[in-house]
Amino acid sequence: MVRVRVTWRQVTRWRAGRQLLTAREPDPVAVARRLCGIHAQVTSCGAGIAQVRGAADPDTATWTDRTLVRTWAMRGTLHLLPADELELWTGALTDRESRRRFPPSWEREHGVTGQDLHAITDAVGEVLGATPMSRTELAAAVQARLGRTDLAGPLATGWGALLKPAAARGLLCSGPADGQTSTFVSPAAWLGRTVTGLDAGTANREVLLRFLSVNGPATTADVARWWGEQPAPARRWARSCADDLTEVEIDGESGYLVARSDAEELAAVPDGGTHPGDGPFLLPGFDPWVIAPLSHRRRAVPDGHEKDVSRTAGWISPVLVVDGRVAGVWDRDGDLIRVRLLDRLPAATRRAVEALARPTGVDWT
């Protein structure tokens, strides 16, 4: 692989642009396409991720236009994916699912065997259609299809561990909520077309290049963590498409990769002066700028403040980003944005943040 040498400032500036933080994109589907999905575990955060990039709230695209699909994807968490790319993600997720193992500890925790889980997954594909079903209704239908009343307890658990394999195979996605009740539908029935995953080789290659195009330069360990499995498969992907990749050395540190088609653009980013990619940016919770890649986060978060950003139970805080670093965390309190600084900010930068937040005021703490 050809090698390019860049600085961290060039990297953070380039990544801000690739993540649509320096240009407005009104279409939430285009945002989801660029970002490799929009986080949707917390609905308000997903809306914020789209809106900070200039897009409309994704709800209309998801539930009315059906151009976005809400489903379990990376790391087994809910994301909004472009409906016309579901075959890509299903192909890669199905391949990931094929590598799962179910040790006795997993079976004890979830109350089913690996064989049971495969049967449940097949049954989900058989009973779901275009009519939304609640978790309770889906559990009852699966039990009836399999003749297994003993599955009532395991299927009722709130985290969906027994339903995620069906999502990976493209047999299940979220339907519109019924009040406070989540529902599920068949993606094929919901979209009115067959959903057949791409072959694993094609899908994995495309997922790797997509990730690097928006989060690179990154390591294969970064890819694996984002995708939700061990590093070995990501290393295989990188070896299989080595001709499409460029090695990147960042401030003398090697081990990073970027798509070869992006290498020239990355190297051309200026290292000095001011740049739109320097921010400031007020990013919502679970923003992809923070989530991936981890190798960037250890440079972006001030020493001793990792737990302010990545909190208990996997919660990723809303952050203030300045010059490629997390300068603070924030939350909303009525008509105020309360910013808790993790680093000192010049007065001019504070004024820029206040202008960015208008008409909402900023309370500095």
Language-model region placement:
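Short, cationic-aromatic polyanion-contact patches
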Residues: 84-86, 178-197, 255-270
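A short, conserved structural fragment
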Residues: 64-73, 168-177, 243-250, 328
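Glycine-rich, small/acidic residue-mixed loop/short-helix segments
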Residues: 305-365
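Loop-centered beta-sheet repeat module
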Residues: 155-235
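Phosphate-backbone binding and catalysis cores of DNA-processing enzymes
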Residues: 1-149, 303
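A short acidic, leucine-rich amphipathic alpha-helix
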Residues: 135-143, 166, 220-224, 324
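Non-catalytic regulatory appendages
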Residues: 244-305
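Positively charged, polyanion-binding regions of nucleic-acid-associated proteins
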Residues: 113-132, 200-216, 238
